[in-house]
Amino acid sequence: MSSDKKTPMPAEAALGDIGRHATGSATSREAGGQVLRSRAWFNNPANIDMTALYLERYLNYGLTREELQSGKPIIGIAQTGSDLSPCNRHHLVLAERVREGIRTAGGIAIEFPVHPIQETSKRPTAALDRNLAYLGLVEVLYGYPLDGVVLTIGCDKTTPACLMAAATVNIPAIALSVGPMLNGWYKGQRTGSGTIVWKARELLAAGEIDQTGFIDMVASSSTSTGYCNTMGTATTMNSLAESLGMQLPGSAAIPAPYRERQQIAYETGKRIVEMVAEDLKPSDIMTKDAFINTIRVNSAIGGSTNAPIHVNAIARHVGVDLTVEEWQTYGHDIPLLVNLQPAGEYLGEDYFRAGGVPAVVAQLMKQGLIKENALTANGKTIGENCRNATIENPAVIKTFEEPIKKRAGFVVLKGNLFDSAVMKTSVISEEFRQRYLSDPKDPEAFEGRAIIFDGPEDYHKRIDDPALAIDAHCILVIRGVGPIGYPGAAEVVNMRPPAYLIKQGISALACIGDGRQSGTSGSPSILNASPEAAANGGLALLKTGDRIRVDLRKGTADALVSSSEWEKRRQDLAASGGYRYPGHQTPWQEIQRGMIDQMAEGMVLKPAVAYQDIAHTKGMPRDNH
């Protein structure tokens, strides 16, 4: 997987003398030397009956034999937008501009659907569908006559699903973000999608708004087509797709309704044809250097705790060794530069107008924190793309010297509760710090009495039960919500305190869980715990009333239970058949539970990571007749 820079080649020159046929003595090659895969389907004189069979059904909606046998590259548009996926629905419009770009550059566009993933409507969790969409897209990219692909990304899980599949197959690929929604407003204040939900829950629990007011407040943030306008998982992953090099520079932050979004869709369509000519593949772009850059960018933008899961999954599928511990190694000491909710004040439109990802990268470059030679989708290095980028609004994007917070990266914790878990330090509020982290003798550590909930249903049923005697220093623990237990790892770790504490002005308690939380949440939870309770991890042994000690400086989280008692609990759990969780409801739930890895390893399907660069290592798929 070379990271050497490739010189961009005009598509019309590179593709000028190709297309005779894909097998035999005269192979279909362009000036760069690679074979266009699609010729094996559409122009194979050595097997004319199969050529005819492959051709004829693509003619029935208006494509011509001349086009399909012209030697022009066939470019897929992996369409993630649909009525079921409102965050990505605008891609149905953008795809027309992508088509025009592909045709302008000398390619032929073929659009196809990707399994829908909508964060806010899929039960039991959209994370269950990331690997399913990945599998389907791998089969399409490998098994159909495609020479390159435009990946339409946006809502949380669509981005990693698409990049994972592109990494596995390893044909030329470029990503196009759908873009964030326009800014939300409620009574003169910015309301960020997702983030406002957690604030509205507090107000509802405190009795300050009724149910109608709750819905009105939440809906105020959903202003237009596009994904969450906060620095949630969607904006995070789209920004990181750019820092990885898989999007055109400056494209991630463009709001969905802006004219620039349609323009970049056209440019993306043009560029993928050139990438096919240059044979510029995901493995050339997504190198270890690109992943190190991405970890640092994630810290600087205040990115979601879902990022380590998804980025590590992408790395595993492209064959790059990346551990959860490296998120602390490379990212912990990076300052917070982007002032977006939930860690800050502003929203997506402001992020774009302030300079987006290039402005952030430029600040990190000045400190020598970016691997500048990492190649990107436009054929240039990230250094070339971002060196002259400027901050256009210093209220939204800060300089490295005057950040919002000096350290914004994740702390990776371990102990007898789990082998690894992640805490997002950029969202630790002053109120939380004063209550949990203000002991001058031990300023980065806290202890608390554990209150255990087995799943969100148990939590919602009992959180306001006075018999639990939850106070301002308790630690809420939720388990059974991981990749196996839920299944899919639910976004439920950011638990609100009991209503009586909210009325006292306590808006957040320390939370620990083997699930995830929305990237739009401002809760400084300890989450992504691996192994999960359903894999008989340490959280399965915990009991309500146990005391937990968390030390951020040492990176530890432990139940203060004797080793002999802990071992006895482990033996008792094994004797009882292990931690119990709900049964399978669908065939896919059973399949995924049997194959899925833990969150620290990217929550990938374990057998799938053995399949890498399959377009080149596995040969052509066999004929179908």
Segments (PLM) and residue ranges:
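Glycine-rich beta-alpha loop segments
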Residues: 91
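N-terminal small/polar loop signature for handling phosphorylated ligands or for N-terminal nucleophile
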Residues: 111-144
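Catalytic or ion-coupling anion/metal-binding cores of large enzyme and transporter domains
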Residues: 2-87, 96-114, 120, 126, ...
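A short, small-residue-rich loop immediately preceding and capping a beta-strand
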Residues: 141-162, 173-178
